[in-house]
Amino acid sequence: MIHPTAIIHRNVFLANDVEIGPFCIIGSDHGPLGLGPGTIVRSHSIIEGGNVIGPGLETGHHILIRTGNEIGTNLRIGTMSRLEGGGKIGDYVRIHGDCEMTKGELRHFSRLYGGSYVTDNRLPPSHVNENAILDEGAVVTMNCVVIAGVRVGVGSFVGASTVVTRDVPDATALVNGKMKPVTELRWKDIEYPWPRNFRDYPAEAQPRLEALHKRIIDLLQ
């Protein structure tokens, strides 16, 4: 269903079951845009043309996706979040509300929590732009900044309000400026590695999720 107040550009191709909410702008003169089966775009959102987007995209309200991104299957992106151009996003990635990413890479099953920013420019600013990477199954929690050129490893975890200025190795937690194996973190009802404990993935993702879980366990050996 396409809300009558939505603006759909002439270069846009929509699957039959796509839902577009009120006051959205879909497409632009930057190039063609296709939105596949299962896509839901909520109100006041803007998705520019020239993006490659897999099926099952689901957005919050007031999101912005600029041109030049490559986005995999079943991205969920929360209210007020922004993807600037040139980003790469894998399958089953979760971006919560009020996040921003510029030319970064979020690999399969990675998660970026509210208020976090993935940058493409080191501090102090320079003419060199480098992609930051969240590897498969990586979790960056609330109000973090991942500096350009940094990699957060497979199955790794970054605690809230952290500025990540150096690589976080695979299966490692960065909390209060200190690194340790993710298995040393314990909260009620949660055991690491992370991916198996999240429940918001469709059934078809489960075999890949289990393979990632096994990979993280092997990294901890």
Residue ranges and their predicted role:
Residues V41-R42, V140:
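Extracellular beta-strand-rich, repetitive "passenger/adhesive" scaffolds
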Residues M1, I7, V12-F13, E19, ...:
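Glycine-rich hexapeptide-repeat left-handed beta-helix
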Residues H3, H9, A15, G36, ...:
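Residue-level recognition of the GNAT/N-acetyltransferase active site
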Residues P32, V41, I47, L64-I65, ...:
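Extracellular beta-strand scaffolds
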Residues E48, P55-G56, G60-T67:
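Glycine/small-residue-rich loop that forms an oxyanion/phosphate-binding "nest" at active or ligand-binding sites
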